[in-house]
Amino acid sequence: MMRILLFLATNLAVVLIASITLSLFGFNGFMAANGVDLNLNQLLVFCAVFGFAGSLFSLFISKWMAKMSTGTQIISQPRTRHEQWLLQTVEQLSRDAGIKMPEVGIFPAYEANAFATGWNKNDALVAVSHGLLERFSPDEVKAVLAHEIGHVANGDMVTLALVQGVVNTFVMFFARIIGNFVDKVIFKSENGQGIAYYITTIFAELVLGFLASAIVMWFSRKREFRADDAGARLAGTDAMIGALQRLRSEQGVPVNMPDSLTAFGINAGLKKGLAGLFMSHPPLEQRIEALRRRG
């Protein structure tokens, strides 16, 4: 909770600085001179409230959504020795990472994958696919679990949601400025906001949202290196490298993880060229090389 409060305080400061900067550069006067009567301070606050509300709401229901969308079955009482081993391994890794043991689940998927989610590092969920358990060695599975525990211990789910909230705020803000400018200056609407405002705002939100997602994905890729590093500390560097090499050998297998969870899975598929800017995970080769440099 302290992380959320500190981050919100930081971003309120960012919003305030942005408002002051726009005023200093005479943006309010420019808009008013062109017939756009817009209170930028009120608009920034409005966009911040709705921008953060959406991302934080998604964060708070993330565990429930993950269970529903993947069909994850929570292991409350282990029925097999594999489930017993899974619970014991997660318990050990959680203890070593200094967090409360998360819920542990298995979801039905042939692909080798895993994810972590939850609004709090002490109220999280870690789940693995049937494919991962069937085809990976115990050391490799442990390394994957350590990677996911690393996400939880680092508070990545919270941080990514807050970064998304900042992005949402400024996408909404600039889309509405563009919409007002087009409506008042180009189409000369006089009585309230015309149809041009709504069409332009929606289009601008789509375009700006798409471009801004590259920023969120850049942060997500940085986050993966940190989770790999945590996995190496908890399970051993060789085991973490081995797990990533095994994932690399399965890159032809389609990834069917829901979009909302892809950023928190260990395997997100492969994209090339400019599409790489919108990847939630770095290429496996880069992740393996980073671990090798770690020693």
From Swiss-Prot:
GO terms for cellular component: plasma membrane. Its cofactor is Zn(2+). Gene3D superfamilies: Metalloproteases ('zincins'), catalytic domain (3.30.2010.10). It holds the Pfam family Peptidase_M48. It is a multi-pass membrane protein. It is found in: Cell inner membrane. The chain crosses the membrane at residues 4-24, 42-62, 158-178, 199-219. Zn(2+) binds at H147, H151, E224. Binds 1 zinc ion per subunit. Keywords: Cell inner membrane, Cell membrane, Hydrolase, Membrane, Metal-binding, Metalloprotease, Protease, Stress response, Transmembrane, Transmembrane helix, Zinc. The keyword Hydrolase applies. GO terms for molecular function: metalloendopeptidase activity; zinc ion binding. Its EC number is 3.4.24.-. GO terms for biological process: proteolysis. It comes from the Bacteria. The active site is at E148. HAMAP family: Pept_M48_protease_HtpX. Belongs to the peptidase M48B family. This is Protease HtpX. It comes from Pseudomonas savastanoi pv. phaseolicola (strain 1448A / Race 6). The lineage of its organism: Bacteria, Pseudomonadati, Pseudomonadota, Gammaproteobacteria, Pseudomonadales.
